[in-house]
Amino acid sequence: MSQKSLQIPAVPTGQTVITTFEMTPATATELMEALQSAFDEVIRHQVGFIGAALHMNDAMTRVCNYSQWRSRDDYKAMLRTPEMIARNRHILTLCKGFEPVMYEVARVV
């Protein structure tokens, strides 16, 4: 993933997606590598992608992905690509589950 700075716009626009993944320490590194690869090779090149950050807790049992998109439709279109369908199937084998939740920025402080 690129090292560009993730910024929350002062005027709430677009779509924020926060996805949490639950895994074991045994699969944490492989999961993070699969997510990094998905962002580097596919997601960052999709229409409407603004930026993202991956976070792992110190127990290596949870990953949180924060991503920003121009619109909800752009995010959904990325999920429907054959490449992401295949990658998400693989990612699901590395974790107990994952849950993307879509948010709109309500306030920036």
Which role fits each region the language model picked out?
Residues 4, 25-26, 45-46:
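Short acidic-aromatic low-complexity motifs
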Residues 7-10, 27-29, 39-42, 53-56, ...:
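Intrinsically disordered, low-complexity segments enriched in polar/charged residues with Gly/Pro
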Residues 15-22, 51-81:
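Short, well-ordered beta-strand segments in beta-rich or mixed alpha/beta enzyme
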Residues 17-18, 31, 46:
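Residue-level signal for functionally critical sites in structured catalytic/ligand-binding pockets
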Residues 22-35:
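Short, surface-exposed ligand-recognition loops at beta-strand->loop->(often short) alpha-helix junctions
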Residues 28-30, 74-76, 109:
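Intrinsically disordered, low-complexity acidic/polar segments
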Residues 37-41, 45-50, 68-102:
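An amphipathic, aromatic/His-enriched active-site/gating alpha helix that lines ligand/cofactor pockets
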